[in-house]
Structures are given as C-alpha cells and as structure tokens.
C-alpha cells in the first residue's frame, strides 16, 4: 500500500490506519531535506549569507523577503513546498474517506483528528515560509488556480483543524500510536 487508498477501500479499522501511513511517510520524506531546519531560521540573525560567497540564492532569506509566495521554485524551498502540499492532499483524501467509511466511529474520529493535525502542521510550515497560501481543504487534486488566502485566514484554518484534532486525538503514551499525533 504505497499510496493513498481508494476512498472505497477505507471500510475497516485496518484500512483507515493503513491509509495514515502515506501521510506520515510524506511528512518523513519532507523532513529528510537538510534545508528544512535552515529555512526556518533564515530571516533571523541566527544564519546569514556572505555577499561575496557562493550562496547567492539564499540572499532572499537575509532580507526575509521570500514570504511573498513567489519563491516556491527556489531550490531551498521547493522540496518543502512540494512535500508539505503532498501531506495536505493526502490528509484531505483521508478526511474525505473517513466520512464514508463504515469503520467504527471511534477509529474514524482518531484518524480524522490525525489527518487534520498533519494538515494543520503542514500549513503552519508553509505559511511561515511563503506567507499568503491557498487554503485547500476540499478535494484531493490541485488545480493550480486556487486563490491565496491571507496569513490570518491561514492561521484561522490551522487553529480550526487543531481544535478539531485535539478532541479526537488519543492521550500520549499509547503504544499502538507511538510516533503518531497525540494530545501532547
């Protein structure tokens, strides 16, 4: 099961839990990028570039002017951009699938909460790096024509997802959920 399962196949508890795997896998793949940690510190005085050096593409970070969303093709940001959007679309698919699943309500609630947490987490990274972002919470295929929402609207969506997730996520310490989202 290397990708998101067909929505028709999300009928049992095992199907729903298995469908979480590609969402977490994409997040793991995104975090393997060595630049992710650095992009979160650029724009501060922690890391700067030297004008005479070979890091010209990184100068946008010194001026903190990369948040206009126009630099998503910058090599240092492209991996994060693509990876977090994949997490969002996988999470959207799972949230849609949970709605029609015949699995027990308790597991549906947990899986929905995890998917919403992962979507919120991804938006949190994207809005900090790119500013105004499209909010795509319906559908699983981007059109490329989604309008950008303001940073405030993005944070409201993040908060909404996190509040819904908080109700559904399990308490920390469950051995069945090691490495997965929980309430802490």
Regions found by a protein language model. Give the residues of each.
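Acidic, glycine-rich segments characteristic of secretory precursors and extracytoplasmic regions
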Residues: 1-44, 48-52, 152
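Amphipathic alpha-helical protein-interaction segments enriched in hydrophobic
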Residues: 178-184
């Amino acid at each position: 099961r290397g990708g998101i399962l067909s929505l028709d196949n999300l009928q049992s508890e095992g199907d729903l839990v298995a469908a979480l795997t590609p969402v977490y896998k994409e997040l793991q793949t995104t975090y393997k990028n060595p630049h992710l940690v650095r992009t979160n510190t650029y724009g501060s005085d922690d890391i700067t570039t030297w004008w005479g050096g070979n890091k010209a593409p990184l100068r946008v970070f010194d001026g903190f002017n990369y948040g206009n969303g126009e630099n998503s093709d910058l090599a240092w940001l492209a991996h994060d951009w693509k990876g977090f959007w994949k997490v969002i679309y996988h999470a959207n698919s799972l949230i849609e699938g949970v709605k029609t699943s015949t699995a027990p309500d308790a597991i549906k609630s947990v899986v929905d909460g995890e998917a919403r947490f992962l979507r919120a987490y991804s938006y949190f990274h994207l809005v900090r790096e790119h500013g105004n972002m499209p909010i795509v919470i319906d559908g699983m295929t981007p059109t490329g024509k989604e309008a950008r929402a303001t940073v405030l609207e993005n944070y409201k969506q993040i908060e909404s997802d996190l509040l819904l997730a908080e109700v559904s996520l399990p308490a920390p310490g469950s051995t069945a959920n090691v490495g997965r989202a929980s309430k802490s």
